[in-house]
Curated annotation (Swiss-Prot):
Disulfide bonds: none annotated. This is Oxysterol-binding protein 2. One of its GO terms (cellular component) is membrane. It comes from Dictyostelium discoideum. Pfam families: Oxysterol_BP.
Length: 391
């Protein structure tokens, strides 16, 4: 078991902590961390500019701020070296929309194939995160991202292509303090909708940063009056080992069908093994014996095994058929407007202090006092939905 020295949050003395122990439960009340001073941020900026390694910067950050296990970093003001020049809305919109063709092709009568389509879509929307020490800019109240996007459907038999243009997504920050976001990707004509109402925390967990995703993904196929509920795994930033991974057990259950999927996102072993590995079972009702087993890597290939016939075949393989065209609908509250003082200079190759610019933007947003404008709470199903579904 790998070990590392970190600070205990109570007495600030160094302790030896096991790699996979001392997990913090999502429901645990976490220690709130006081914001760092401008001087502390400036010192970290200097450390970054000195050419120090990323790991050295991270460990210095932990030590200087007295961060211990269970510290809530959700609203902590990070130095530039820990920030990406785009909003969290990039994850909710682009990642959830890019494989929407999988769901459109799964809008079929076969219950098992439809469920497998949902499974493939859920795996495919996970972003491959290259840097375990950087995070996007937290979105602000009322911030939006909206677009029409086109996807290409490829017929598996004759390989003919069909472009479907009437797909849309809308993302809006509903509660900045809780990092609560409403997101919907849909095709009104096809009656296919994805709702992603989630709250995200960032918790220091010793040898990793833990990001529990609180809330479910809801996928609807109105043609069949079918609704799927998908629970979310926990995201771990393994900063000492240099990668990010999803871990934990999740389920895909149906409102009407007895078919369901149990999925386990496996943690990479300390020695050997691979990251992003998944094991899953497709089951029916109370029968504990699976109909299908699914194994592989969500970032590479997944195979499916028919437990009765023992037939094994490829379920999917990355890369996929990304959306062919995006037509942004730039609202006054769009992410590109909110963060333009950060996004524009960086796109031009100019070096700026992201953390300081972010603080200025947040102060300005408080004065604007934006309200929720694009979503409303549907009290019939307790889901935040777009006020208007575009045709």
């Amino acid at each position: 078991m790998a070990k590392t020295k970190i600070l205990n949050k109570n007495n600030k003395k160094e302790e030896i902590i096991d790699q996979e122990e001392n997990e913090v439960d999502v429901k645990t009340t976490c220690k709130e961390l006081s914001p760092p001073t401008d001087l502390e941020i400036e010192n970290l900026e200097k450390l970054e500019n000195s050419g120090a390694s990323r790991l050295h910067i991270v460990l210095s950050f932990i030590k200087k701020n007295g961060i211990g296990i269970g510290t809530d970093l959700t609203h902590f003001e990070f130095a530039s070296s820990f920030l990406l020049p785009h909003s969290t809305h990039e994850y909710y919109s682009d990642n959830m929309a890019r494989e929407f063709d999988i769901l459109l092709k799964s809008n079929i009568d076969n219950e098992i194939e439809r469920l497998l389509g949902v499974f493939k879509y859920i795996l495919s929307i996970k972003p491959i995160i290259e840097d375990s020490t950087r995070s996007p800019l937290r979105s602000v109240n009322g911030e939006t991202k909206s677009s029409n996007f086109h996807v290409t459907i490829i017929d598996e038999q004759d390989k003919s292509e069909k472009i479907i243009k009437d797909n849309y997504y809308m993302v809006e920050t509903l509660d900045q303090e809780k990092a609560f976001v409403g997101s919907c990707i849909y095709n009104k004509r096809e009656g296919v909708k994805v709702h992603f109402n989630t709250e995200t925390k960032t918790i220091f967990n010793g040898t990793n940063i833990k990001l529990p995703i609180i809330g479910n993904i809801i996928i609807r196929f109105e043609k069949f009056n079918e609704e799927y509920t998908i629970t979310n795994p926990t995201l771990y930033g393994r900063y000492l080992r240099g990668f990010v991974e999803y871990c934990g057990e999740t389920t895909i259950t149906s409102k009407n069908s007895k078919y369901y999927i149990k999925k386990t996102n496996l943690a990479k072993p300390l020695i050997g093994g691979n990251v992003n590995m998944v094991e899953a079972k497709l089951l029916y009702g109370d029968d504990p014996n699976p109909l299908f087993k699914i194994n592989g890597s969500w970032s590479n290939e997944m195979e499916i095994i028919n437990c009765k016939t023992k037939e094994t075949k490829l379920l999917y393989k990355r890369p996929f058929n990304y959306f062919t065209k995006i037509i942004p609908d730039i609202l006054p509250t769009d992410s590109s407007i909110v963060w333009k003082d950060i996004i524009v200079p960086i796109s031009k190759g100019e070096k700026i202090n992201i953390s300081k610019e972010r603080s200025k933007i947040l102060e300005y947003q408080k004065k604007l006092n934006w309200k929720i404008s694009q979503f409303h709470l549907n009290t019939d199903n307790n889901i935040w939905e777009p006020i208007i579904y575009k045709d």
